[in-house]
Curated annotation (Swiss-Prot):
GTPase that plays an essential role in the late steps of ribosome biogenesis. This is GTPase Der. GO terms for molecular function: GTP binding. Associates with the 50S ribosomal subunit. It comes from Agrobacterium fabrum (strain C58 / ATCC 33970) (Agrobacterium tumefaciens (strain C58)). One of its GO terms (biological process) is ribosome biogenesis. Residues 3-167, 205-380 form the EngA-type G domain. Keywords: GTP-binding, Nucleotide-binding, Repeat, Ribosome biogenesis. The gene is der.
Amino acid sequence: MSFTVAIVGRPNVGKSTLFNRLVGKKLALVDDTPGVTRDRRPGDAKLIDLRFTIIDTAGLEQSGPETLQGRMWAQTEAAIDEADVTLFVIDAKAGLTPADETLGEMLRRRGKPVVLVANKSEARGSDAGFYDAFTLGLGEPCPVSAEHGQGMIDLRDAIVEAIGEDMAFPPDVDEAETDIVLPRTEPGSEEEEDEEPVYDETKPLRVAIIGRPNAGKSTLINRFLGEDRLLTGPEAGITRDSISVEWDWRGRTIKMFDTAGMRRKAKVTEKLEKLSVADSLRSIRFAETVVIVFDSTIPFEKQDLQLVDLVIREGRAAVLAFNKWDLVEDPQAYLADLREKTERLLPQARGIRAVPMSGQTGYGLDRLMQSIIDTDKTWNRRISTAKLNRWLDAQTTQHPPPAVSGRRLKLKYMTQVKARPPAFMISCTRPEAIPESYTRYLVNGLRKDFDMPGVPIRVHYRGSDNPFESKAKKRR
């Protein structure tokens, strides 16, 4: 991307709507409730012939630095410092407010390029707000409607004028780089099943961080990044959008998704929280590995267990992070107790990697990242058909399938049909009669003998064709 644009303004003027319009996707949550956006969210934007990075920010309201509003203000100021040009969005329909004037003064003092955007200009009565905006001293407002896509050509021209054509159209950017970048195929899609089985360490690893509210998810990511990139604090439920950040760990690109804390469904009543949870679920489905953050001081709440079960059912690789380990007394005894509870309460994820750590102090972060990499490798594991059939023969010899209606079931052949997660197909007689207990026996054997702890393992059955079956029925 050639340059960076920050979108700022007071709450509820349409910043996230404009952000979604420019990135061409509904990435940012949009609601009539003021103050939906809290963290700064980057995205790849396209506006006519411009390609740039755009940053959505929280609605600016001045407050003390120790308050939530004050910390949101600091995040927005960081976005302005990072950007080459700022889009200052006002609500032309509502007109100027003292908050707009305060923000305008702050932007003037910074001396960086600013484009004044009069949003909602399609509404009746917006003319007065448009002309009032001249008093901000930031030049002629650019009238747009982010919701309806009006005024985008004028906005493009205003951005080019603000930063200059040299920055808007750098000579070293070729045509290939200005194409729209489509997202990679999501895990589990038909296209991905044809991928080479070799584990590719050059590809970015997508990791979602989930957990109950106030488990320390954003603090953990900030510690990884080494900066206060995400908004944190003692208040539960600060994060609303799923925010993605990229960084390198020992030469491997990691793309992490911070998500909103997820409570029990019965407690989620507000529309905005439902939108946040839906956004978190999308991040889980798009991730490869999911880190479930537990609060070590109150681990294994019912919601914690349900989140692990959700990740396993979605077929994602899972790692447990026992956060706030700095608050634990007698860590050795407590860790032994946690491991016992993990095996007992999470039988569907037997052997799952669990790491004690502290986002506050940085304790255990390297072990957590290594566990994420190791789990992802296991999730991508492929086993040769020859090894699988030798293993199947040994398993059925040691513990033969049960007899159903007086006839013993026969498992004849086994192959791996896909990875991510590992899935196997067994050719057998009467697949519908295989009991669930025998499938669990096979899954546990695969997990143990092929060293696949903690990842979902799928076993499917199909009937083996008998070419003489129809003739046998006729003789009867």
